UniProtKB/Swiss-Prot annotation:
GO biological process assignments: phenylalanyl-tRNA aminoacylation
Positions of Mg(2+) binding: E249
One annotated Gene Ontology cellular component of this protein: cytoplasm
Subunit structure: Tetramer of two alpha and two beta subunits.
GO MF assignments: ATP binding; magnesium ion binding; phenylalanine-tRNA ligase activity; tRNA binding
Family: Belongs to the class-II aminoacyl-tRNA synthetase family. Phe-tRNA synthetase alpha subunit type 1 subfamily.
Subcellular location: Cytoplasm
Protein name from the UniProt record: Phenylalanine--tRNA ligase alpha subunit
Length: 334
């Protein structure tokens, strides 16, 4: 073992002496002092050395390692580091810009809608996405046999717990805690068993509620007209078309002039010149009864819209699924 140490020392020092550049020194350093180098291999042989020789051999091995480290240090001073020599930085090259994230288009639209309503004096309410059947259906005047309660349309967690199908439950929860006047919007995620180019199982919705004395359909039209003109432009035509919702009476769908063909008729609007964007109506008296409001003194209106629907119309997107595919080629356009 003593002879091996001496031979390794002689060979290593000779190799260091004959090295001609920093790269060769780096390679020799790895060969002799690396984790799998010759010195470490020699150290592993200490287990076979007789006990009475171990102190001497151990001292010689450590001296070898220290001597080689000193020799390599002097060689690096002479030639410099191979790594430093190879990694020359050209400071005249342009830098690589850092990738910076941005707001998702749905987030942008959602914030824009919320900003419009807060400037109109609305509060923002948040609530649970896993909701009781009572708040999601019963308190909103959905009969027990209403199609929306079917498994085809609703994700049931248990017999009386669902993933909310709209954010309307927050209207009921708000009225339970607050006496009129009420002016609130409820943005959030909702869930329905539906998936195609215009529907996803999870989507974003914003619903609103106004309750006070003397509230009329004219107030509803004024608020929603302001919303449409703020999101699109003040020349965008809109109409209120009679419809039905269990929690409003009368009810109306709100259509705007087709943003694709400007009302002349195209495939997107089924050649009608109009596109549906949201539902609305005067709050049904039975909804007020569930929260203990006196229907002889107050009235109110409610409305709801899908954020994806608004974004599709504003940006001219024909497939709702593009918003959720995380394709940067698409998202970077916004």
């Amino acid at each position: 073992m003593k002879t091996q140490i001496q031979e390794l020392r002689t060979q290593a020092l000779a190799d260091i002496e004959s090295a001609g550049d920093a790269k060769a020194i780096d390679e020799l350093n790895i060969r002799y002092l690396g984790r799998k180098g010759l010195v470490n291999d020699l150290m592993k042989g200490m287990a076979k050395v007789p006990a009475d020789e171990k102190p001497l051999i151990g001292r010689l091995a450590n001296e070898l390692k220290n001597d080689l480290q000193d020799a390599f240090a002097k060689a690096v001073e002479k030639f410099g580091s191979g790594k430093e020599a190879g990694d020359v930085v050209d400071v005249t090259l342009p830098g690589r810009p850092r990738k910076v994230g941005g707001l998702h288009p749905l987030t942008t639209i959602n914030l824009e809608i919320c900003d419009i309503f807060t400037r109109l004096g609305f509060d923002i309410a948040q609530g649970p996405e896993v909701e009781l059947d009572y708040y999601n259906f019963e308190a909103l005047n959905f009969p027990k046999d209403h199609p929306a309660r079917d498994m085809q349309d609703t994700f049931f967690v248990s017999d009386n717990v669902v993933l909310r199908t709209h954010t309307s439950p927050m209207q009921v929860r708000t009225m339970e805690k607050q006496k009129p006047p009420v002016r609130v919007i409820a943005p959030g995620k909702v869930y329905r068993c539906d998936s195609d180019i215009t529907h996803t199982p999870m989507f974003a919705q914003v619903e609103g509620l106004v309750v006070d004395k003397g509230i009329s359909f004219a107030d509803l039209k004024g608020v929603l007209t302001t919303l449409v003109h703020q999101i699109f432009d003040d020349k965008t035509p809109l109409r209120f078309r009679p419809s039905f919702f269990p929690f409003t009476e009368p009810s109306a769908e709100v259509d705007i002039g087709c943003v694709m063909c400007k009302g002349s008729g195209c495939r997107v609007c089924s050649h009608t010149g109009w596109l549906e964007i949201l539902g609305s109506g005067m709050v049904h008296p039975r909804v007020f009864e569930f929260v203990g409001y006196d229907t002889s003194e107050i009235s109110g209106f409610a409305f709801g819209m899908g954020v994806e629907r608004i974004a599709m119309l504003k940006y001219g997107i024909d497939d709702i699924r593009k918003y959720y595919e995380n394709d940067l080629r698409f998202l970077n356009q916004f």
